[in-house]
Amino acid sequence: MSVILYQPGKKLMNDFLQSIIDRDPAAKSKLSLILTYPGVKAIFFHRIANFFAKAKFNLIARIISQFSRFLTGIEIHPNANIGKNLFIDHGMGVVIGETSDIGDNVTIYHMVTLGGIAPSINSNNQRNVKRHPTIQDEVVIGSGAQVLGPVTVGRCAKIGANAVITKDVPEKAVMVGIPAKNVGLADSEFKPYGITPDSDTKKNNE
């Protein structure tokens, strides 16, 4: 999993935009992505905020992050580590916490939370520790899903809509439900907006 702190350049931007076109049939052009996709704007601002956060200009980083949240409806903490080609589709209501790590070519739909578990009364014992998820490469997280705590979601896993993840997820698993269960459908159809086909059938057969 590669993490980008700050990597400007035309090729990086072109690759990012092309990766969205490859995943979203509604994407018509790179210009339309830049002008109209909140997820693209949120990543652009996060790269800048993350640069300032790494340089210890924390107030500037938070101001940029808050402006991005106001503009896009997407909240990404400046210290979150995000790899290449993260596609936040629709975007409204997405929250990515401070110690989140996200790999390459990840897709996240609206209303997703990459959050911590309920804080203790004394927050000092949670500073400088891993509190948020690690999302490995090629993961898809469906709308409304909650991935909570310092768990790891393995490569190419798929998280169904509104699923709640509080434990590690194996590579290529398909997780649905509350609490989420692995329904073992890694090679079958997956719907990030609703119930994955045959998930109820499998559950009833267990």
Language-model region placement:
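Short, glycine/charged-enriched secondary-structure capping and boundary segments
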Residues: 122-123, 156, 174, 188-191
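Extended, non-globular alpha-helical segments
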Residues: 60, 64, 107, 113, ...
